[in-house]
């Protein structure tokens, strides 16, 4: 995909996020929207995957460590062809396979169940070690929230990743600077994030996580990096793409009402139309 196609796809992913959360009347739109560009690049450009064969042995693995932002993950998987886009409206409903957190047993394309913050990166490190032990060449990607990295388990896993020189592992931090209680700098600041990962022997890349040029360059650089794992610190805007949700901690974990949903979809439709004019 070229940059324009990626931007159009990310806009569709964002529409899916808003639709899913509105339908469920609960969920986490803010962090899903902030990471939509990263999800899109991973699943439509970067990763070796096949929606027709989700469990193929040589596929790249992805672990959503910040599992509460499942709406963004699900919308990406649906638009990539793992399951019908129409199923997004069943989010969190009784009997639906699309529950509030990713479930590897029931959702095509999900490599690891997640939800308890800090655990996803540990699973990703284990997958990367497994690949090394088996001489497999698949790569492992994991997406964390910047509030999540307040968890001590994140740094235990990072210590091991650096020690084992896991150059097949890419850790992405969605650095939107907001969590449910407000700014991460006010709650329990993890800054400087880059220096912490560097201390654990990571190659660190700082980018604008809502800019496809920078996203592409970062993942290409990560592929060229040998002997150490890579951490991509992606500065993003929480709620990106919906004006009244942007940079607002209050949209961490609530659904838009009917009026707000209509406004959000109108904005995203206009954004899509503008992209089609380019």
Name each model-derived stretch.
Residues 17-21, 32-163:
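Cofactor-binding active-site loop characterized by glycine-rich and histidine/acidic residues
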Residues 109, 113-116, 121-224:
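Thiamine diphosphate
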Residues 212-278:
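Glycine/aspartate-rich loop-and-adjacent alpha/beta segment that forms the canonical ThDP
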Residues 1-13:
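N-terminal hydrophobic or amphipathic helices/low-complexity stretches enriched
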Residues 68-69, 73, 176-177, 211, ...:
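Glycine-rich beta-alpha junction loops
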Residues 80, 187, 246-250:
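Short secondary-structure boundary/capping segments
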Residues 10-26, 174-176:
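N-terminal capping segment at the start of a domain
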Residues 74-75, 103, 153-155, 181-185, ...:
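Short acidic, glycine/serine/threonine-rich loops at helix termini
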């Amino acid at each position: 995909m070229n940059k324009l196609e990626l931007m159009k796809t990310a806009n569709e992913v964002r529409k899916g996020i808003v639709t899913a959360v509105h339908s469920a009347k609960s969920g986490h739109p803010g962090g899903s929207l902030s990471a939509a560009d990263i999800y899109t690049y991973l699943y439509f450009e970067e990763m070796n995957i096949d929606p027709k064969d989700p469990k193929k042995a040589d596929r790249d693995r992805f672990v959503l460590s910040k599992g509460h932002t499942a709406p963004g993950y699900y919308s990406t998987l649906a638009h990539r062809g793992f399951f019908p886009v129409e199923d997004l409206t069943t989010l969190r409903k009784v009997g639906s396979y699309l529950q509030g957190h990713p479930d590897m047993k029931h959702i095509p394309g999900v490599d690891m169940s997640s939800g308890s913050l800090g655990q996803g990166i540990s699973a990703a490190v284990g997958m990367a070690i497994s690949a090394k032990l088996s001489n497999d060449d698949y790569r492992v990607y994991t997406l964390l929230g910047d509030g999540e990295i307040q968890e001590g388990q994140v740094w235990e896993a990072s210590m091991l990743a650096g020690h084992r020189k896991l150059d097949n592992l890419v850790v992405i931090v969605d650095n939107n600077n907001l969590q449910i209680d407000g700014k991460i700098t006010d709650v329990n600041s993890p800054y400087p994030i880059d220096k912490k990962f560097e201390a654990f022997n990571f190659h660190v890349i700082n980018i604008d996580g809502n800019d496809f040029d920078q996203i592409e360059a970062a993942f290409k650089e990560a592929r060229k990096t040998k002997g150490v794992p890579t951490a991509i610190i992606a500065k993003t805007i929480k709620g990106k793409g919906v004006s009244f949700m942007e940079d607002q901690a209050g949209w961490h974990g609530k659904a838009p009402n009917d009026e707000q949903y209509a406004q959000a979809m109108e904005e995203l439709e206009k954004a899509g139309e503008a992209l089609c004019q380019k």
